[in-house]
Each structure stands twice: as structure tokens, then as C-alpha cells.
């Protein structure tokens, strides 16, 4: 009877000590879901209120640098916008981690 209790306790302690996920395995979210949740590549920024000639990035951003390079490849800047409509976007900010 004591043997079963010892085995059960040992098994439980091993299960609790096993790591679940790597903490370095994070996913980059350029524009967290909020008011500014739409990733856009825009050519002209007018005081952060309006952006002109905007389009969605051609690749899903892997990190801030990748997002900026993807937009720079088409001559635009990475932005997180609130309301993208017909190539224009209202209320835009820089993406997370961008310079």
C-alpha cells in the first residue's frame, strides 16, 4: 500500500516538473487587436490622422523589421491603422517594435 502511494507521489511530481512550452516561442503581432488592429503599408502620413496610398502587406510580418522591410520594398512605411478604406487609412500609428 505504501509502495503505491510513493509511486503515485513520484509520478505526480515528475508531471508537475515537466516544462509545457518554450518561453522563447513567441509570435509577433504587429498590430494587436484594438482600435489600431489593421496592418498597412502606407506612402504618406498626415499627422497620424490620415494615411494615403495604403495597402495590406504582401507577407505576414514575422517581426517589426520584417514588417518595415516588406513595406519599404514597395516604397511605403509600416503602419497600424484603425479604418482602412479604398487605399486610405484613418488614425494610424507605428507598429509594435518599429523605430
From Swiss-Prot:
Signal peptide: 1-26
Entry annotated with the keyword Disulfide bond: yes
Lineage of the organism: Eukaryota, Fungi, Dikarya, Ascomycota, Pezizomycotina
Subcellular location: Secreted, Cell wall; Secreted
Species of the source: Sodiomyces alkalinus (strain CBS 110278 / VKM F-3762 / F11) (Alkaliphilic filamentous fungus)
Family: Belongs to the cerato-ulmin hydrophobin family.
InterPro entries named in the record: Cerato-ulmin_hydrophobin, Hydrophobin_sf
GO cellular component: extracellular region
Protein name stated in the entry: Class II hydrophobin 1
Function text: Aerial growth, conidiation, and dispersal of filamentous fungi in the environment rely upon a capability of their secreting small amphipathic proteins called hydrophobins (HPBs) with low sequence identity. Class I can self-assemble into an outermost layer of rodlet bundles on aerial cell surfaces, conferring cellular hydrophobicity that supports fungal growth, development and dispersal; whereas Class II form highly ordered films at water-air interfaces through intermolecular interactions but contribute nothing to the rodlet structure.
Keywords assigned: Cell wall, Disulfide bond, Secreted, Signal
Disulphide-bonded residues: 31-80, 41-71, 42-54, 81-92
Biotech / industrial applications: HFB1 is partly responsible for the reported antifungal activity of S.alkalinus, and may serve as a potential source of lead compounds, meaning that it can be developed as an antifungal drug candidate.
CDD domains associated with the record: hydrophobin_II (cd23508)
UniProt cross-references to SUPFAM superfamilies, sorted A to Z: Hydrophobin II, HfbII (SSF101751)
Amino acid at each position: 500500500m505504501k509502495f503505491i502511494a510513493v509511486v503515485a507521489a513520484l509520478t505526480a511530481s515528475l508531471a508537475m516538473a515537466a516544462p509545457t512550452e518554450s518561453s522563447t516561442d513567441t509570435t509577433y503581432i504587429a498590430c494587436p487587436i484594438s482600435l489600431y488592429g489593421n496592418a498597412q503599408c502606407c506612402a504618406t502620413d498626415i499627422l497620424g490622422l490620415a494615411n494615403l496610398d495604403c495597402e495590406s502587406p504582401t507577407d505576414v510580418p514575422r517581426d517589426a523589421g520584417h514588417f518595415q522591410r516588406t513595406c519599404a520594398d514597395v516604397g511605403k512605411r509600416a503602419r497600424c491603422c484603425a479604418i482602412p478604406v479604398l487605399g486610405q487609412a484613418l488614425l494610424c500609428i507605428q507598429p509594435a517594435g518599429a523605430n
